[in-house]
Regions:
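Cell-wall polysaccharide-cleaving catalytic domain and substrate-binding groove, primarily
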Residues: 1-182
Length: 182
């Protein structure tokens, strides 16, 4: 369905994720790599996740040196594939995959499953896909945007990061609408 969208999603993701950060207030960033190195993020990949992916320590100098080509397979395997991006409606794939990167694949999937009224187990399977096909793509993208915004507003650190999360959600929503096959 949406296999053609992987590269476009990755490009949009790189726009949102940007370069190197070391914000210890960020709960998604503050965990170290498990080897005594403080948490940092490059192109949206945390030191913890990069160390897990490579099986090697991820000190700041390693993180700063990461390139888009380095992280692309990581994002495809750990985010796009678990949310079954290739099986989702075009446009909806962007919305769910971006939430998966921002809040975890399971959360991204559960948000979608709640919208569909199916068991929210965090794994997009055949039941979820069947329910998706019983719904209008644009309606699902709109509902996902609203649900994602609601999720962010409930977070304790919304006062710190909310403006950026809301901007990202809106940009993803607008892009998602342009990709829907009507």
């Amino acid at each position: 369905m949406a296999e053609k969208n992987w590269q476009g999603f990755f490009d949009m993701l790189m726009h949102h994720e940007g370069g190197f950060t070391d914000d210890q207030r960020d709960k998604g960033n503050s965990q170290g790599d498990g080897h005594g190195n403080e948490g940092s993020t490059m192109l949206g990949v945390t030191a913890f996740n990069w160390a897990k992916w490579t099986g090697k320590p991820a000190p700041k100098e390693v993180m700063r040196a990461l390139t888009k080509d380095d992280v692309k397979p990581f994002y495809e395997k750990d985010y796009w594939t678990p949310i079954r991006g290739n099986d989702l409606y075009s446009g909806l794939d962007y919305s769910i995959a971006d939430m998966a990167v921002n809040a975890g694949p399971s959360r991204g999937a559960k948000l979608f499953q709640r919208i569909l009224g199916v068991t929210a187990d965090g794994a997009i399977g055949n039941q979820t896909l069947k329910a998706m096909h019983d719904n209008d793509p644009l309606d699902l993208v709109e509902k996902y945007y609203d649900a994602r915004e609601g999720f962010y507003r409930k977070l304790d650190d919304y006062s710190i990061y909310g403006k950026g999360w809301s901007r990202r959600n809106k940009e993803t929503f607008e892009k998602s609408k342009t990709l829907i096959d009507l």
